[in-house]
Amino acid sequence: MSANRHPVPLDHGEINALLAAQWVAPDALARPRDHWQRRLAVVVPYRDRAQHLRTFIPNLLDYFRIDKLDRNIPLHIHVIEQADELPFNRGRLINAGFALIGDTADYLCLHDVDLLPIWADYAFPLHPSRLCWYGSPNSQQRHLYIGGVTAISSADFRTLNGFSNDYWGWGYEDHDLRLRMIANGLKAEARDGAYRALPHPHNGLTADGGESETGRRNRERIETLHREGFTAWQRDGLNSLAFDHIGSAPLQIEGRSVEQATLHRVRFA
């Protein structure tokens, strides 16, 4: 396995400082002239959140219809449903969505189903961009994270080899993505979007607020990969993805097809 293009520091203080320093401010003037014509695929990893989905889809489509800037973006929503009994795997679902979408999108917005935009900037990203700032968890250390709502060009997603396929259950797949960005020298853009979070269980915590078993397991996994030099991303991601595509169809909300949304059902072996 070849070395990373850019070294990933082993010291936690160093890596936190590097993560904080990598953020850049949005520069609308630097965006390509045709950025409003770039095709956007909103990718929503999903399972067992029917009520959230019924709220999220109309809310997002209404937002794009009303917003004076984002209304011009060619948009399609892809809900990627995990239809098996295995633990939820957000990263693998997003990878599967990217594989199914193919060349129909110029950039992606990786969107949790429980975050509703109040104000946000969904324009084409020059760098992988965290859209959710206000209303996001971990507000005291949010410069370290890129989860929740993330815009990334299809080219950058390929460069990173997508997400890891091996974070089962809650957490740390987005931390892994940030380390992939460091290894490839990609900066992160911080946009100041405001979102409303729908109520949902925090599966990384136990009832008394302690770390859950899945949270501990995934934390230990990324810590091990980090200690080993974090080169595993080169063989774990889009190039190692395996899934069964059960089928795709127009998304149904309240018995009606949603023209700008497709439901893709997949399962993992």
Q: What is each residue range found by the language model?
A:
Residues 19-32:
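A short, compositionally biased domain-edge/stem linker segment
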Residues 31-37, 49, 55-73:
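Short, acidic, metal-binding catalytic loop of nucleotide-sugar glycosyltransferases
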Residues 38-44, 60, 76-78, 97:
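Hydrophobic targeting segments
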Residues 35-40, 128:
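A short, charged/proline- and glycine-enriched loop
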Residues 44-45, 54, 69-84:
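Short beta-strand/loop segment that forms part of the nucleotide-sugar
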Residues 41, 52-55, 59, 92-96, ...:
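Acidic, Ser/Thr-rich intrinsically disordered and amphipathic helical segments
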Residues 1-21, 56, 166-169, 175-269:
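C-terminal catalytic/acceptor-binding lobe
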Residues 85, 89-94, 98-100, 107-111, ...:
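Conserved catalytic core of nucleotide-sugar-dependent glycosyltransferases
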